[in-house]
Amino acid sequence: MSRIKAILFDMDGVLIDAKEWHYEALNQALKLFGCEISRFDHVHTFDGLPTKDKLELLGKVSYLPTELHEFINQLKQQYTMEIITQKCKPLFQHEYALSRLKREGYLLAVCSNSKRKTIIEMMERAELLEYLDLIMSNEDVEKAKPNPEIYITTMKKLNLQPEECLILEDNKNGIAAAIASGGHLLKIDTVYDVNYTNIRTKLQSI
């Protein structure tokens, strides 16, 4: 085994192909108030941010009163859970990768800008929850990605140094957080890049 002792996974776009779900759910909530995010802006400006931060950004560029943000956020979470119930399914290559890495002795964690309830629901439906040693959500930190706090806090909870951790990330905010944390980075383009072979190859290169 390499000197890596833990593998830290982002969730959306890494373990779960959920970017479109968040886009659909947020716009469903926003449309009730005459607002909408384009698909381009969601990918290039809002990708990887917590809903609270997305709404704060929207408030600066459009007429979206601050007093509506919490209500819209709650609506968005409700719509997201409805979509998860319909669409979130296990992906064999992820089950195989995490189960094998777990057997090999690696600590496994999910570090996501999503809410804890959403993470647990997705991980249960993807049949990955049993392999995780730790779940970190946006509710566990003061500053979400691109701030590295979530990764630094995870490393401390696992009692590990940054150089002992491999982080899998897919978007600019997550990648910035991973790099700033000092951990090793495996950049992911799609959820299908997350497989045992790719992770093992990266581990052997460290």
What are these model-derived regions, one by one?
Residues 59-60, 81, 85, 106, ...:
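A broad detector of the eukaryotic-type serine/threonine protein kinase catalytic domain
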Residues 102-108:
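Short, conserved structural micro-motifs that define repeat-unit consensus positions
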Residues 2-95, 99-100:
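N-terminal helical cap/lid subdomain that shapes the substrate entry/recognition surface
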Residues 35, 106, 183:
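Short phosphate-binding/catalytic loops that engage adenosine nucleotides
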Residues 109-110, 187:
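Hydrophobic beta-strand core positions in alpha/beta domains
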Residues 1-7, 95, 99-102, 115-206:
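Asp-based, Mg2+/Mn2+-dependent phosphohydrolase catalytic module
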Residues 14, 112-114:
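Conserved phosphate-coupling serine/threonine residues in phosphotransfer and NTP-handling enzymes
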Residues 17, 88, 110, 164-166:
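Residue-level marker of alpha-helix boundaries and capping positions
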